[in-house]
Design a protein with these regions (language model features):
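Residue-level signal for inorganic ion chemistry
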Residues: 23, 47, 58, 95, ...
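DPxDG-like acidic metal-binding loop motif
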Residues: 80-140
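An extended, acidic
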Residues: 149-215
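Generic detector of well-ordered alpha-helical packing
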Residues: 48, 71, 91-94, 125, ...
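Short, isolated positions in well-ordered beta-strands
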Residues: 118, 146-148
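N-terminal subdomain of lithium-sensitive/metallo-dependent phosphomonoesterases centered on the IMPase/IPPase/PAP
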Residues: 1-92
Length: 215
């Protein structure tokens, strides 16, 4: 089935943009921050509120879709074996950055059909960067077509990610990062895997490495 003619991707993009503005305009205090399982693993009341908003608004656009979100909220079915449409949501990717107003966090929404990704939307409201991609139609940054870089490691920036709550392979990770440091022009760690991957898609980085990412 051709989903491109069935799904209103522009409407989804607008919802993701509105969710990003909720994050940008947030007034965070310590009583709105909670710990999840693992070291330095946080969730804020804004993670929950933004996910609720996304589920409610995206349901209006694609009522038949299921939802797999990072946070436990109503409407989040978290079904892994789906043959139909399913939204995958990270309401705030880069929560620690968000907590400290580091301004490198994003709203990340993917859409899958029959267990295959067909579209993705990543929005950083702090610099108004909207990354979009639809299967078969290419990837874009604010409407401009983007491509992965042609250059190799020695001619570009290498990026990586790590988290203290997923620290079982950090020794291996930092050995590889040391090699990337020696062989590249520079190494960066942004703190948002979705944004760092988009940087590779846009040609700003040549590689992104992280040992463990939760879906």
């Amino acid at each position: 089935m051709d989903m491109n003619s069935k799904v209103d991707y522009k409407a989804i993009e607008e919802v993701v943009r509105r969710a990003g503005m909720m994050m940008k305009e947030a007034h965070l205090s310590s009583d709105l921050v909670h710990h999840k399982e693992g070291a330095a693993n946080f969730v804020t009341s804004y993670d929950v509120a933004i996910q609720r908003f996304l589920i409610e608004e995206l349901h209006r656009i694609v009522p038949e879709a299921a939802f797999f979100g990072e946070e436990e909220t109503e409407g989040n079915t978290r079904e892994k074996e789906l043959d139909g449409l399913c939204f995958l949501i990270d309401p705030i990717d880069g929560t620690t950055n968000f907590m400290f107003r580091y301004n490198y966090s994003c709203v990340s929404v993917g859409l899958a059909y029959a267990k295959e990704m067909i579209a993705g939307f990543v929005y950083n409201p702090y610099v108004d960067e909207m990354f979009t991609a639809v299967r078969g139609n290419g990837a874009y940054l604010n409407g401009r077509r983007i491509h992965v870089p042609d250059s190799g490691l020695k001619d570009g920036i290498a990026s990586f990610g790590c988290a203290r709550y997923n620290n079982s392979d950090t020794d291996v990770l930092f050995r590889v990062v040391q090699e990337m440091f020696n062989r590249s022009l520079a190494v960066r760690c942004g703190g948002s895997a979705a944004l760092d991957l988009c940087r590779v898609a846009a040609g700003a980085s040549v590689v992104y490495l992280e040992m463990k990412l939760n879906p």
